A protein has these predicted regions:
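Membrane-embedded alpha-helical bundles of multi-pass transporters/translocases
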Residues: 1-259
Protein backbone atom coordinates (compact mmCIF):
# COMPACT_ATOMS: atom_id res chain seq x y z
CA UNK A 1 0.00 0.00 0.00
CA UNK A 2 2.64 2.66 0.88
CA UNK A 3 4.65 1.70 -2.18
CA UNK A 4 1.70 1.85 -4.56
CA UNK A 5 0.11 5.00 -3.18
CA UNK A 6 3.23 7.02 -2.48
CA UNK A 7 6.44 5.46 -3.83
CA UNK A 8 5.30 4.92 -7.41
CA UNK A 9 3.26 8.13 -7.45
CA UNK A 10 6.22 10.23 -6.35
CA UNK A 11 8.44 8.73 -9.03
CA UNK A 12 5.80 9.55 -11.63
CA UNK A 13 5.47 13.13 -10.37
CA UNK A 14 9.17 14.02 -10.42
CA UNK A 15 9.91 12.45 -13.83
CA UNK A 16 8.78 15.44 -15.96
CA UNK A 17 10.54 17.85 -13.59
CA UNK A 18 13.81 15.95 -13.85
CA UNK A 19 13.45 15.71 -17.63
CA UNK A 20 12.92 19.46 -17.89
CA UNK A 21 15.98 20.21 -15.77
CA UNK A 22 18.07 17.78 -17.81
CA UNK A 23 17.00 19.32 -21.13
CA UNK A 24 17.82 22.77 -19.77
CA UNK A 25 21.17 21.44 -18.49
CA UNK A 26 20.12 22.68 -15.06
CA UNK A 27 22.27 20.47 -12.84
CA UNK A 28 21.31 22.37 -9.69
CA UNK A 29 17.59 22.04 -10.39
CA UNK A 30 17.97 18.36 -11.27
CA UNK A 31 19.85 17.73 -8.03
CA UNK A 32 17.38 19.63 -5.85
CA UNK A 33 14.35 17.87 -7.34
CA UNK A 34 15.82 14.40 -6.92
CA UNK A 35 17.10 15.23 -3.44
CA UNK A 36 13.61 16.39 -2.46
CA UNK A 37 12.15 13.16 -3.82
CA UNK A 38 14.55 11.04 -1.79
CA UNK A 39 13.83 12.90 1.44
CA UNK A 40 10.06 12.91 0.92
CA UNK A 41 10.16 9.17 0.24
CA UNK A 42 12.07 8.44 3.43
CA UNK A 43 9.74 10.60 5.54
CA UNK A 44 6.80 8.43 4.50
CA UNK A 45 8.35 5.03 3.87
CA UNK A 46 10.47 4.55 7.01
CA UNK A 47 7.53 4.80 9.44
CA UNK A 48 5.47 2.66 7.06
CA UNK A 49 8.16 -0.03 7.17
CA UNK A 50 8.41 0.12 10.95
CA UNK A 51 4.65 0.05 11.40
CA UNK A 52 4.17 -2.91 9.05
CA UNK A 53 6.94 -4.88 10.75
CA UNK A 54 5.66 -4.27 14.28
CA UNK A 55 1.98 -4.65 13.40
CA UNK A 56 2.33 -7.52 10.94
CA UNK A 57 0.37 -10.03 13.01
CA UNK A 58 -2.36 -7.60 14.16
CA UNK A 59 -2.82 -6.45 10.57
CA UNK A 60 -2.99 -9.96 9.09
CA UNK A 61 -5.30 -11.23 11.84
CA UNK A 62 -7.68 -8.30 11.46
CA UNK A 63 -7.93 -8.59 7.68
CA UNK A 64 -7.73 -12.32 7.05
CA UNK A 65 -8.29 -14.45 10.16
CA UNK A 66 -11.83 -15.64 9.50
CA UNK A 67 -13.33 -19.01 8.60
CA UNK A 68 -10.65 -21.51 7.63
CA UNK A 69 -7.87 -18.92 7.92
CA UNK A 70 -6.51 -20.04 11.29
CA UNK A 71 -4.35 -18.30 13.87
CA UNK A 72 -1.37 -20.37 12.72
CA UNK A 73 -1.97 -19.25 9.13
CA UNK A 74 -2.06 -15.65 10.36
CA UNK A 75 1.27 -16.09 12.12
CA UNK A 76 2.89 -17.61 9.04
CA UNK A 77 1.51 -14.84 6.81
CA UNK A 78 2.76 -12.22 9.26
CA UNK A 79 6.27 -13.66 8.84
CA UNK A 80 6.08 -12.92 5.11
CA UNK A 81 4.75 -9.42 5.76
CA UNK A 82 7.59 -8.80 8.20
CA UNK A 83 10.26 -9.95 5.75
CA UNK A 84 8.89 -8.06 2.77
CA UNK A 85 8.34 -4.89 4.83
CA UNK A 86 12.06 -4.82 5.61
CA UNK A 87 12.65 -4.09 1.92
CA UNK A 88 10.01 -1.37 1.64
CA UNK A 89 12.50 1.56 1.78
CA UNK A 90 14.54 0.00 -1.02
CA UNK A 91 11.45 -0.68 -3.15
CA UNK A 92 10.30 2.93 -2.75
CA UNK A 93 13.70 4.58 -3.20
CA UNK A 94 14.26 2.59 -6.40
CA UNK A 95 11.00 4.05 -7.73
CA UNK A 96 12.31 7.52 -6.85
CA UNK A 97 15.77 7.03 -8.35
CA UNK A 98 14.59 5.43 -11.61
CA UNK A 99 13.20 8.72 -13.05
CA UNK A 100 16.72 10.17 -12.81
CA UNK A 101 17.70 7.65 -15.50
CA UNK A 102 14.54 7.84 -17.57
CA UNK A 103 14.72 11.66 -17.62
CA UNK A 104 18.11 11.31 -19.34
CA UNK A 105 16.70 8.68 -21.74
CA UNK A 106 18.86 6.03 -20.11
CA UNK A 107 16.79 2.84 -20.00
CA UNK A 108 19.73 0.45 -20.22
CA UNK A 109 21.11 1.05 -16.73
CA UNK A 110 17.84 0.27 -14.86
CA UNK A 111 17.54 -2.96 -16.87
CA UNK A 112 21.08 -3.97 -15.89
CA UNK A 113 20.36 -3.27 -12.24
CA UNK A 114 17.05 -5.11 -12.43
CA UNK A 115 18.62 -8.20 -13.99
CA UNK A 116 21.37 -8.24 -11.37
CA UNK A 117 18.73 -7.92 -8.65
CA UNK A 118 16.68 -10.76 -10.14
CA UNK A 119 19.67 -13.11 -10.24
CA UNK A 120 20.66 -12.08 -6.72
CA UNK A 121 17.11 -12.77 -5.54
CA UNK A 122 17.38 -16.38 -6.69
CA UNK A 123 20.77 -16.77 -5.01
CA UNK A 124 19.50 -15.17 -1.79
CA UNK A 125 16.44 -17.45 -1.82
CA UNK A 126 18.58 -20.58 -1.92
CA UNK A 127 21.22 -19.31 0.52
CA UNK A 128 18.78 -18.00 3.15
CA UNK A 129 16.55 -21.04 2.88
CA UNK A 130 19.56 -23.29 3.40
CA UNK A 131 20.58 -21.16 6.38
CA UNK A 132 17.15 -21.41 8.01
CA UNK A 133 17.05 -25.15 7.40
CA UNK A 134 20.44 -25.47 9.10
CA UNK A 135 19.31 -23.35 12.06
CA UNK A 136 15.70 -24.47 12.55
CA UNK A 137 15.33 -28.00 11.21
CA UNK A 138 16.48 -30.97 13.32
CA UNK A 139 19.00 -33.27 11.71
CA UNK A 140 16.59 -36.20 11.46
CA UNK A 141 13.99 -34.08 9.65
CA UNK A 142 16.50 -33.04 6.99
CA UNK A 143 16.91 -36.65 5.90
CA UNK A 144 13.39 -36.65 4.46
CA UNK A 145 14.29 -34.39 1.55
CA UNK A 146 13.88 -30.73 0.72
CA UNK A 147 10.18 -30.72 -0.22
CA UNK A 148 9.17 -32.78 2.80
CA UNK A 149 11.16 -30.48 5.05
CA UNK A 150 9.51 -27.38 3.59
CA UNK A 151 6.07 -28.93 4.05
CA UNK A 152 6.61 -30.04 7.64
CA UNK A 153 8.60 -27.17 9.15
CA UNK A 154 6.61 -23.91 9.42
CA UNK A 155 8.24 -20.53 8.92
CA UNK A 156 10.88 -21.39 6.33
CA UNK A 157 9.11 -19.16 3.81
CA UNK A 158 10.42 -16.22 5.87
CA UNK A 159 13.65 -16.62 3.88
CA UNK A 160 11.85 -15.72 0.66
CA UNK A 161 10.62 -12.38 2.01
CA UNK A 162 14.06 -11.44 3.31
CA UNK A 163 15.63 -12.49 0.00
CA UNK A 164 13.28 -10.19 -1.92
CA UNK A 165 14.14 -7.34 0.44
CA UNK A 166 17.90 -7.88 0.12
CA UNK A 167 17.73 -8.05 -3.68
CA UNK A 168 15.84 -4.74 -3.68
CA UNK A 169 18.58 -3.13 -1.60
CA UNK A 170 21.12 -4.46 -4.10
CA UNK A 171 19.09 -2.93 -6.92
CA UNK A 172 19.09 0.41 -5.08
CA UNK A 173 22.84 0.29 -4.40
CA UNK A 174 23.63 -0.43 -8.06
CA UNK A 175 21.36 2.34 -9.32
CA UNK A 176 22.80 4.81 -6.82
CA UNK A 177 26.38 3.89 -7.72
CA UNK A 178 25.75 4.29 -11.45
CA UNK A 179 23.87 7.55 -10.92
CA UNK A 180 26.79 9.00 -8.98
CA UNK A 181 29.21 7.73 -11.62
CA UNK A 182 27.19 9.56 -14.31
CA UNK A 183 28.02 12.81 -12.47
CA UNK A 184 24.64 14.45 -13.01
CA UNK A 185 23.52 14.73 -9.40
CA UNK A 186 24.87 16.55 -6.36
CA UNK A 187 23.67 15.44 -2.94
CA UNK A 188 22.32 18.49 -1.14
CA UNK A 189 23.64 19.57 2.28
CA UNK A 190 21.91 18.66 5.52
CA UNK A 191 21.51 14.91 5.07
CA UNK A 192 23.17 13.96 8.36
CA UNK A 193 20.90 16.22 10.40
CA UNK A 194 17.89 15.09 8.38
CA UNK A 195 18.57 11.39 8.94
CA UNK A 196 19.26 11.81 12.67
CA UNK A 197 15.97 13.65 13.20
CA UNK A 198 14.08 11.17 11.05
CA UNK A 199 15.50 8.17 12.90
CA UNK A 200 14.64 9.74 16.26
CA UNK A 201 11.05 10.32 15.14
CA UNK A 202 10.80 6.71 14.00
CA UNK A 203 12.32 5.52 17.27
CA UNK A 204 9.64 7.41 19.18
CA UNK A 205 6.91 5.87 17.04
CA UNK A 206 8.43 2.40 17.34
CA UNK A 207 8.56 2.64 21.14
CA UNK A 208 4.95 3.83 21.24
CA UNK A 209 3.83 0.89 19.12
CA UNK A 210 5.86 -1.55 21.21
CA UNK A 211 4.28 -0.32 24.44
CA UNK A 212 0.87 -0.44 22.78
CA UNK A 213 1.41 -4.06 21.76
CA UNK A 214 2.24 -4.96 25.38
CA UNK A 215 -1.18 -3.66 26.42
CA UNK A 216 -3.16 -4.99 23.45
CA UNK A 217 -4.65 -8.49 23.59
CA UNK A 218 -3.56 -11.40 21.42
CA UNK A 219 -5.09 -10.56 18.03
CA UNK A 220 -5.40 -14.23 17.10
CA UNK A 221 -7.89 -15.00 19.91
CA UNK A 222 -10.12 -11.91 20.23
CA UNK A 223 -13.19 -11.20 18.12
CA UNK A 224 -13.36 -9.12 14.94
CA UNK A 225 -14.46 -5.85 16.52
CA UNK A 226 -11.77 -5.95 19.19
CA UNK A 227 -9.17 -6.51 16.48
CA UNK A 228 -10.46 -3.57 14.44
CA UNK A 229 -10.61 -1.31 17.49
CA UNK A 230 -7.16 -2.18 18.77
CA UNK A 231 -5.57 -2.00 15.32
CA UNK A 232 -7.13 1.42 14.75
CA UNK A 233 -5.84 2.60 18.12
CA UNK A 234 -2.33 1.32 17.44
CA UNK A 235 -2.13 2.78 13.94
CA UNK A 236 -3.67 6.09 14.99
CA UNK A 237 -1.53 6.33 18.12
CA UNK A 238 1.64 5.51 16.23
CA UNK A 239 0.86 8.07 13.54
CA UNK A 240 0.12 10.72 16.17
CA UNK A 241 3.38 10.06 18.02
CA UNK A 242 5.31 10.20 14.74
CA UNK A 243 3.67 13.48 13.72
CA UNK A 244 4.34 15.09 17.11
CA UNK A 245 7.93 13.84 17.14
CA UNK A 246 8.47 15.25 13.65
CA UNK A 247 7.17 18.65 14.74
CA UNK A 248 9.27 18.65 17.91
CA UNK A 249 12.37 17.75 15.89
CA UNK A 250 11.83 20.64 13.51
CA UNK A 251 10.07 19.10 10.51
CA UNK A 252 7.46 21.29 8.85
CA UNK A 253 4.99 20.94 5.99
CA UNK A 254 7.39 22.79 3.72
CA UNK A 255 9.67 19.74 3.92
CA UNK A 256 7.06 17.92 1.83
CA UNK A 257 6.93 20.62 -0.83
CA UNK A 258 9.13 20.36 -3.90
CA UNK A 259 11.83 23.01 -4.07
Amino acid sequence: FPLGVFGIALGTVILPTLARHHVNTDRAGFSKSLDWGLRATLIIILPAMLGLMLLALPLVSTIFQYGKFTAEAARMTALSVFGLSFGLPAFALVKTVLPAFYARQDTRTPVRAGLASMVANMVFNIALLALLVALWVPEEARQEGVMATLARVPGLHFALGIASALSSYLNLVLLWRWLRRADVFDLQPGWTRFLVRLLLANLAMGLALWFGLQVAPDFTVVDKWQRIGWLGALVGGGALVYAVAMLVLGFRLRDFREH
